[in-house]
Amino acid sequence: MVEEGAPGAGPADVWREARRRLARAGHDRYHVRHQVTGAAIPRDIAYFAMQVEFVAYTLLTIVPIPEDYREDHYWPSQPERN
């Protein structure tokens, strides 16, 4: 396996970064709550998750995957939550 951020990063590295960004936004907590109680995932978090997934799939179409795939300029801004 290639180290994160190293030249030649693979699909697993891109998905790891996507999951990290989703977790930082609290998506995991809302997703579990949705599964357990049926409560809807907040719209801004659901939209953010859709954007992150789109970016991850798009990065995977670039050959080779950019060395700086973890940089914020590729990814959507995290929603502001109170």
Language-model segments: what does each one mean?
Residues M1-N82:
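A preference for well-ordered globular domain cores
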